[in-house]
């Protein structure tokens, strides 16, 4: 599938985004910043990526996810859990970074700090009803209803 990628900051030409291996599901996003950003414990900041994408197909979206190693080893996760990029958004990709560790985290210029994956989506046709046409076995069982 073709997704247009626009380089907004020429510094990124040194480190173009791409898949690390043939089996990679996501591309790494780099911090497109001129100097290091320091995140104190519990702090959240937006970090620029220097790129924009044009998915242009409403059957797909992009998701920004944390990099596993940084989240597990350093405590660098996303401030909003997951970043959802709609197919018609064409602005710069920004990443909300949150430090869940007790130590200050440094995000260095051009550091790989998040990842982007393209996923299929379905736009549902919602029908307003008084009652559901069928009741599931679970019905209204909510949080913890199947055990902890």
Swiss-Prot record:
Keywords: Hydrolase, Magnesium, Metal-binding, Nucleotide metabolism. It is an enzyme of class 3 (hydrolase). Substrate binds at residues 67-69, 80, 84-86, 94. One of its GO terms (biological process) is dUMP biosynthetic process. Its cofactor is Mg(2+). It catalyses: dUTP + H2O = dUMP + diphosphate + H(+). Pathway: Pyrimidine metabolism; dUMP biosynthesis; dUMP from dCTP (dUTP route): step 2/2. GO terms for molecular function: dUTP diphosphatase activity; magnesium ion binding. Its EC number is 3.6.1.23. This enzyme is involved in nucleotide metabolism: it produces dUMP, the immediate precursor of thymidine nucleotides and it decreases the intracellular concentration of dUTP so that uracil cannot be incorporated into DNA. Belongs to the dUTPase family. This is Deoxyuridine 5'-triphosphate nucleotidohydrolase. It comes from Francisella tularensis subsp. tularensis (strain SCHU S4 / Schu 4). The gene is dut.
